[in-house]
Amino acid sequence: MAPITVGDVVPDGTISFFDENDQLQTVSVHSIAAGKKVILFGVPGAFTPTCSMSHVPGFIGKAEELKSKGIDEIICFSVNDPFVMKAWGKTYQENKHVKFVADGSGEYTHLLGLELDLKDKGLGIRSRRFALLLDNLKVTVANVENGGEFTVSSAEDILKAL
């Protein structure tokens, strides 16, 4: 499947997360992104070094600035189960705006065309590192990394595009 690109409508599919009442929710991407400006940024795995030390902290640190520029939702996305994503999210005590969601089976990652084969590292099929800016479901920015790079998908890169 070809990777999602600028101008595409983000595919519908389901993601899972724990809500503020600690209840597991499984919702469609369209239900949380329709009519909104949403940043969906993907990482190869929870608790992995680049994701944990650079990618996620960048979005947490810039969340207020992103919100001030009209962003309604900031979503961190990974092919992990929702329990792992919940635990990972709790490690960022300063986080007030980034929602940690799971694509447990990798099905949504496949719909996006952003799969990354990390079987040789014992991680299976994961998500490429990326940052998408969605405006009422339409992709207006698609910053997708190659391999394990972290050069175009930061919060700063999204801010430059706003």
Curated annotation (Swiss-Prot):
The active site is at C51. GO terms for molecular function: thioredoxin peroxidase activity. The keyword Oxidoreductase applies. Its EC number is 1.11.1.25. GO terms for cellular component: cytoplasm; plasma membrane. It is an enzyme of class 1 (oxidoreductase). Keywords: Antioxidant, Cytoplasm, Oxidoreductase, Peroxidase, Redox-active center. Residues 4-162 form the Thioredoxin domain. It comes from the Eukaryota. It holds the Pfam family Redoxin. One of its GO terms (biological process) is cellular response to oxidative stress. The keyword Cytoplasm applies. Exclusively expressed in buds and flowers. Also detected in pollen. It is found in: Cytoplasm. Thiol-specific peroxidase that catalyzes the reduction of hydrogen peroxide and organic hydroperoxides to water and alcohols, respectively. Plays a role in cell protection against oxidative stress by detoxifying peroxides. May be involved in intracellular redox signaling. Monomer. This is Peroxiredoxin-2D. The gene is PRXIID.
